[in-house]
Regions:
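Outer membrane beta-barrel strand-and-loop segments of large Gram-negative receptors
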Residues: 356-358, 511, 517, 530-589, ...
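A short, solvent-exposed loop/turn motif at the edges and junctions
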Residues: 13-29
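Surface-exposed extracellular loop regions of Gram-negative outer-membrane beta-barrel proteins
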Residues: 152-153, 159-175, 243-247, 268, ...
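Membrane-proximal, glycine/serine-rich, low-complexity loop/turn segments characteristic
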Residues: 44, 49, 55-279, 294-327, ...
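C-terminal beta-barrel architecture of Gram-negative outer-membrane proteins
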Residues: 613-661, 666, 673-685, 689-692
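Short, surface-exposed beta-strand/beta-hairpin micro-motifs centered on an aromatic residue
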Residues: 2-8, 125
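Outer-membrane beta-barrel translocator domains and adjoining extracellular loop/strand segments
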Residues: 152, 213-227, 272-289, 329-340, ...
């Protein structure tokens, strides 16, 4: 209803009373200068047996963006962090900690509209450390404006701002207990200081957990006109310790220009102990049977440092610079003993060091005629140094295998220039057309060879059209394209053994892939959505398993395909049953096709028809005490494919109970995720040409979580940034 300020010294506690003819009265006891956001509940009016109820729109179209009022949508949810809030937005689907937007190939995420070099994965990890109370609004774009320096779909998470004319300290702290197969925990502290145009925020988060991983495999490997049956049992225990620190400062000048400086540090230590039991049976000579036992310990850690400076001017100018440093050494101790008398004792030392710079300059013009112009430039440089050595026990100590030594450097240069024009044609029709030109060069150098991986330019046109039949009926159409490059380790020719039969290998011949996609979105009554989508990706790559034709090994490696093609429809249906039950149903059906004419001696052209059903439910059990319950479910039909993989069905059921108390300053939440341990395919099958195997995955995603959160000083969080590490690591 508005922003209010009382110019009165706060020398004692006060009681504020909020009253409006259309809303229920709210009383609030305050002891701090910044009250934060106060949400009023709408009244129901009964007039002569006629009940008139007000309903807020689920979604609005603002400048080509689908805008969601997050506090209103999520006020009764049991979410305890920002990620849990975001993943429940209409049209978003969460799978194994990854967010998908219905009808989009990939979803980029930014905070408060600021340019960022962080990947979606890294930003998701950061959102998990933020309180849910921080999220104020979410903006979804199927076709991101060029000024954001991302291509394709974009989710802009707008976080609440705490501006105060007098010095103010606020904060939140919380602890989580998590029970997977083993117990774990998480703790966080967020502090914010504001004074007129200056603010400083601090985030500290730490977590510790142990994960159980494993696979059971049955394979029939054809080699030299013979067939060997391999039966394998893998189990691993992974210890993870992780910490995050973020310090940010913002200053707003009198003319509304804003200067932002942020430092981000994330460090983790991962210790994995894996054992595997493998049996080999020659089907033509059953007497030729052998068994091996593999013990693998992988001890590694990583650290990411990021510093970012950005200036946003009131005249439409944005400029900034970003630097990221990544360091990740690891030691792998591999021992394998076979009943045929062979034994392998090997140590694999690896190290990756990445330095990346990025600068940008954007300018926006808004003309009185209704036209808008946005243009800018972006430049970047990255250097990745990858090192891998193998030492084998030969009876007199460990000796290095000089031929297997890999020491390479990959340097990248990138330059972008873009222009974008927008126009509102009356009150109904609006259009945005943009073009980005990109030059990308990557050089690879090692002790064996020097080569140019990629040296190419590309154009990325974008079109966004929207037509408003009425404020409650909107049609939107988007066309965009994107390009995805492999990770640094993925093109490095190193090999990492998993056990006596399986290994992970790099692919120096891996190529980037281009994506072309389009969406048509119809919004009915500002809450129901119908989405039609199509996506074509030539040279698409994914990690696939194949059985070697030169040795008895199965290899996990990223491989290019000829193309991937998907097209389908989705519908989103929200509904309420009084104040007690709030629900949303998402239904999606699509056709997928993947083709490859040369995959290790075989070819495939595969298609599948799939369906997805997702339902989220919130129940308002009672107001005093304030108890809310959520039950969410998702089901994916069997038949999904990835290359030569056949994936089984997946479903997930989660439930939670949240108690809010101490005048909404504290909450206690009990939640069960993936209750039936069924969120990943139970079985992955391969039966293409001479490739045959069955793999059953062990699921350790089932979790019981108990969370306590306490806010002090009227805390409402500020924005945090992170870094793109999607191409770092193995």
């Amino acid at each position: 209803l508005g922003d209010f300020r009382l110019n009165h010294p706060l020398d004692q506690s006060y009681r504020l009373i909020f009253q409006h003819i259309l809303y229920n009265m709210v009383e609030k006891e305050i002891t701090t200068a910044n009250v934060g956001t106060v949400v009023l509940e709408e009244k129901d009016y009964q007039l002569a047996e006629i009940t008139v109820k007000g309903e807020r729109p689920q979604v609005k179209l603002e400048g080509g963006k689908l805008t969601y009022d997050v506090p209103q949508l999520m006020k009764d949810k049991t979410a305890t962090n920002a990620f849990e809030i975001i993943k429940d937005l209409p049209g978003l689907i969460e799978r194994n900690d990854n967010l998908e937007l219905v009808g989009a190939s990939r979803l980029n995420i930014i905070l408060n509209g600021q340019l960022t070099t962080m990947s979606a994965d890294q930003l998701i990890q950061l959102l998990k450390t933020m309180p849910a109370s921080r999220v104020e609004k979410a903006e979804v774009m199927y076709n991101a404006p060029a000024k954001y320096n991302v291509k394709g779909a974009l989710l802009n998470v707008v976080l609440s701002k705490n501006e105060s004319e007098i010095p103010s300290w606020q904060g939140e702290t919380g602890v989580d207990y998590t029970q997977y197969r083993h117990a774990g925990g998480d703790a966080h502290v967020n502090l914010l200081y504001t004074n007129k145009g200056f603010s400083i925020d601090f985030l500290l988060n730490g977590n510790k957990r142990r994960d159980v991983m494993g696979e059971d495999m049955l394979a029939r490997h054809t080699l030299n006109s013979g067939m060997t049956e391999i039966s394998q049992h893998n189990r691993a225990l992974v210890h993870v310790n992780r910490g995050t620190v973020r310090l940010g400062m913002d200053y707003t000048f009198a003319n509304e220009d804003k200067l932002s400086l942020a430092y981000y540090l994330k460090g983790d230590k991962v210790l994995s102990d894996r054992d595997a039991f493998t049996s080999y049976l020659d089907l033509s000579k059953p007497e030729n049977k052998s068994e091996s036992t593999s013990l693998v310990r992988d001890d590694g850690h990583s650290a990411i440092h990021n510093i970012r400076l950005q200036y946003d001017g009131h005249a439409g100018i944005s400029a900034g610079a970003d630097f990221t440093r990544y360091h990740s050494p690891s030691v792998l101790d591999y021992q394998d003993t076979n009943t045929n008398g062979s034994r392998t004792d090997m140590i694999n030392n690896t190290r990756q060091d990445v330095s990346r710079w990025s600068v940008f300059l954007n300018k926006t013009h808004s003309f009185a005629s209704g036209w808008g112009l946005n243009y800018g430039v972006h430049g970047g440089y990255a250097s990745s140094k990858n090192y891998s050595e193998y030492l084998y026990e030969q009876g007199a100590g460990y000796e290095m295998d000089e031929e297997a030594l890999e020491d390479n450097t990959q340097k990248e240069y990138i330059a972008d220039i873009f222009a974008e024009v927008s126009k509102n044609f009356g009150e109904r029709f609006s259009a945005t057309v943009g073009l980005k030109g990109e030059y990308f060069k990557s050089d690879y150098a090692s002790s064996r060879e020097n080569m140019n991986l990629w040296n190419e330019g590309a154009l990325f046109p974008t079109v966004s059209l929207s037509y408003t039949f009425s404020p409650r009926h909107i049609l939107q159409f988007d066309i965009s394209s994107d390009k995805t490059y492999p990770g640094y380790w993925q093109v490095s020719p190193q090999v990492t053994p998993l056990n006596s039969y399986s290994e992970v290998a790099g692919n120096p011949l891996l190529k980037p892939y281009r994506t072309y996609e389009g969406q048509m979105v119809y919004i009915f009554r500002q809450k129901y959505m119908l989405v039609a989508f199509c996506e074509y990706t030539p040279d698409y790559f994914a990690q696939l398993l194949y059985q070697s034709d030169t040795e008895l090994k199965t290899v996990f490696r990223f491989e290019n395909m000829d193309y991937s093609l998907e097209a389908g429809l989705a519908v989103i249906i929200p509904f309420n049953v009084g104040r007690f039950w709030n629900s949303r149903i998402t239904l999606r059906g699509w056709r997928m096709q993947e083709k490859n004419d040369n995959f290790h001696g075989i070819s495939y052209n595969r298609e599948a028809y799939l369906g997805l059903a997702h339902m989220s439910n919130t129940f308002n059990l009672c107001d005093k005490p304030n108890l809310k319950m959520t039950i969410d479910g998702q089901y994916v039909t069997p038949g999904a494919i990835q290359g030569i993989y056949d994936l089984g069905s997946m479903y997930e059921i989660s439930a939670g109970l949240k108690w809010t108390f101490l005048n909404d300053r504290a909450s206690l939440t009990l939640k069960g995720d993936d209750i039936f341990a069924s969120s990943i395919p139970r079985t992955i099958k391969i039966n293409q040409g001479n490739q045959w195997s069955r793999m059953r995955k062990l699921n350790d995603e089932r979790c019981l979580k108990l969370s306590f959160v306490w806010k002090f000083g009227g805390y409402k969080e500020r924005e945090h940034d992170s870094i793109d590490t999607s191409r770092f690591g193995k």
